[in-house]
Amino acid sequence: ADLLDVYLSEREASPRYVESLKRTVKHARTCGLLDTSQLLPEKVNEFLTRLPLAAVTRSNIRRELLTLWRFAFEHSYTDVPPLRVCRIKAAPPPPRAWSLDTLRTLLAAAEKDERPVSRRIPGLLWRDVLPCWIVIGYDTGLRLSDLLHLHESNIVNGCVICTAQKTGKFTVRSISPAGQELAARLFKRSPDGTLFRWALPRRRALGKWKDFLREQQIVGSSRWLRRSGATYVEIKRKGEAQKFLGHSNAALATRHYLDQTLTMDIPESPPPLR
């Protein structure tokens, strides 16, 4: 953990990246990698092999651990270079997103959900919160952490203006008239000016989405709002999804966000046999 503190003291890092690095260090310490003297190829390979996590997650942990190890080597905290660490093949599954029909089904169901959000907020129902989340999430493509941190001051001239928690990038996204109306209603009830956070801690938000989608028998998660928004932006104007998502690498959108069954960016089919 001391190495991580030194590493972070010498560079700027987004809150999400800091959280991710801390999780990686916690995993390493739990598995016996307690200090820089134990950063050895055989120990790191054993650690990565034994992690009971998906290949994509283990690949991310490997990358972050090598980053810290390289920093330790360059600053003479260890004389062992970060070499001979086995690669982890982690091919992400093809990205999926919701169609407009599915999004409208979700929105209609959310508007009818009359269950209370929390005992501590009498009178606040899910139909007051969830439709706003769906529309704003789809309109803006903001990540969960950014949605939760939205404040009334972030809404200007029909747009969201904020700094992305994960990347630290300045972000401006337009909101549809329906989204503006839903947000205005919710802001009137907010005691602290936040749009969602006053009523929805992160854990409750994730739990509600999981339960809501299971009840509707619809596959996905709240992050599919970002994918769906990006997919339909790409359909509307090819190449625009990268800007919508705030990516500096154009390949990320295609690899992780755009549902090609919706964009129809697929090869021509051969002639039918019948």
Predicted regions and their residues:
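Phosphate-coordinating loops and pocket residues in cytosolic domains that bind phosphorylated ligands
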Residues: P41, A108, H149, N157, ...
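Conserved tyrosine-mediated DNA breakage-rejoining catalytic core shared by Y-recombinases
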Residues: T102, T140, S145-R185
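Active-site/catalytic core of tyrosine-dependent DNA strand-transfer enzymes
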Residues: S176-V219, E234-R237
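C-terminal catalytic core of tyrosine-transesterase DNA break-rejoin enzymes
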Residues: C132-V135, D139, S145-D146, W224-S248, ...
